[in-house]
């Protein structure tokens, strides 16, 4: 099934949305794609920014390029396909192509919203951890996705403690604005990876129950939003695949748009 046809079903299910006006925290830079092409002078209100991070086993997983690391799963299709949905569902002027940033680069501070995937073995040296901490405390918002089960949680938290050794992780509840800032997500579901097509299971390893967790700053703002035992990136990437259930992609789009709204207004 063609992408547009499949996405239309998802977007019609979601329905019309309110205008997303005045969301930008900073004036974004002119578009510069990793492929060296794109709109020249147009400026955007939002960019999907992906964190390229080092790991304990692979370093940056191909630091000189844009392939090979756990950070690049679903890349770039998930990022771009999600932004196609954002373009259709909102009036937000989003960049059509994603940005990729490293914790070593000052570029990170130009992009107040970041997504990271496969974070179970991420690892930061002291300077990188300091920069990540500074980014988040200055108003940055980080979404982490696709880590499953008790062992991966502990491994993920080892990296998280390098950034915030003293801040606690809390379970987010239905009272949190994150779940209501645009879409009311009172009934949340576990979004599985693509393996669901073959296994019929929404979970991986021992990660049977989905969790939405977070780390807050001193004002109560969520700085890090954690989708534990779920994989919304796969739902974005495979929204055009008729074998992947539409209910998962529909929820993933709504949750992702709420992430944008929350991150850019808090």
What is each of the regions a protein language model found here?
Residues 1-6:
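Positively charged n-region of N-terminal signal peptides that target proteins for export
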Residues 8-19:
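Bacterial N-terminal signal peptides
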Residues 21-113, 117-120, 231-266:
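Aromatic-Pro/Gly-enriched surface loop or interdomain linker
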Residues 27-32, 56-63, 152-233, 237-238, ...:
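An acidic, glycine-rich "communication" segment
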Residues 48, 108-153:
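Short alpha-beta junction capping motif
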Residues 78, 82, 128-131, 152-160, ...:
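Stable alpha-helical elements in mature extracytoplasmic
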Residues 87-91, 99-102, 107, 124-132, ...:
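Non-catalytic interaction surface on structured domains
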Residues 92-102, 144-149, 167-175:
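Surface-exposed patches in mature extracellular/periplasmic domains of secreted proteins
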């Amino acid at each position: 099934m063609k992408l547009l046809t499949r996405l239309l079903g998802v977007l019609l299910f979601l329905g019309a949305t309110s205008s997303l006006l005045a969301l930008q925290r900073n004036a974004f830079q002119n578009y510069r794609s990793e492929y060296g092409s794109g709109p020249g002078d147009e400026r955007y209100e939002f960019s999907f920014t992906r964190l390229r991070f080092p790991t304990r086993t692979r370093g940056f997983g191909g630091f000189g390029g844009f392939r090979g690391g756990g950070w690049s799963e679903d890349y770039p299709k998930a990022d771009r396909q999600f932004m196609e949905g954002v373009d259709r569902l909102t009036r937000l002027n989003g960049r059509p192509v994603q940005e990729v940033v490293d914790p070593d680069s000052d570029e990170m501070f130009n992009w107040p919203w970041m997504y990271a995937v496969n974070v179970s073995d991420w690892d930061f040296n002291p300077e990188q951890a300091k920069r990540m901490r500074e980014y988040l405390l200055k108003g940055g918002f980080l979404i982490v996705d696709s880590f499953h089960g008790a062992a991966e949680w502990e491994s993920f938290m080892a990296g998280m403690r390098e950034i915030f050794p003293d801040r606690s992780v809390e379970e987010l509840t239905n009272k949190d604005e994150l779940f209501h800032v645009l879409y009311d997500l009172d009934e949340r579901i576990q979004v599985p990876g693509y393996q669901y097509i073959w296994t019929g299971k929404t979970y991986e390893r021992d990660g049977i129950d989905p969790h939405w967790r977070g780390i807050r700053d001193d004002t109560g703002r969520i700085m890090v939003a954690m989708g534990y035992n779920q994989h919304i990136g796969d739902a974005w990437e495979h929204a055009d695949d008729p074998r992947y259930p539409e209910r998962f992609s529909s929820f993933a789009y709504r949750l992702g748009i709420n992430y944008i709204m929350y991150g850019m207004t808090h």
